[in-house]
Amino acid sequence: MNPPFESKYGCLTIVGNVLKNVPEHTKCAFILPDKKLEKDRKGPKLLKHSTLEKIIKLPEKVFSEGITTSIFIFEAGVPQNGKEVFACYIENDGLETVKNQGRQDIKDRWQAIEGEWIEIIRKQTGSDTIQWIEPSEHLSYQRHEKAFEISDEDFTKTMMDYLMFKEGIDVKEFGEKLLTKVL
């Protein structure tokens, strides 16, 4: 189910109603914004009556630019009780955006990729992107941040800029004076 992200009632109200009204042990899948369960106070409350079993983070460009989504799979009527949540990230689905046509499998890659991901999700193993999430800490896939790196050249330039600022030296004026002396 892909409930409206924002509307009069809110997507988590719709999710909650579905989970309450299907038979116990029914598997329910919802496409939601990545952090929706964490940012909305209703998110953690859903876990009192249903188990969030899996989070499948979708590729960045599935919807419009800047909207990142995941598939959240619940088992209705069974409380979470602290059980860890399986999560993975389908970083590349092989689809490409075609102007005025959306995302298309123009290079025929999806079939192979789909089979691989179905196995990974079913077995809950086989990908470096797999995480086991504590629901008391997070309710979304946690992307690893790349370590901050800076080159010696960038560090030197930044330090020079800072020292010139600290000493009150006008960079433009300094550059002009230096150029005049050299020429």
Predicted regions: what they are:
Residues 3-183:
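A conserved structural/catalytic subdomain of Rossmann-like adenosyl-cofactor enzymes
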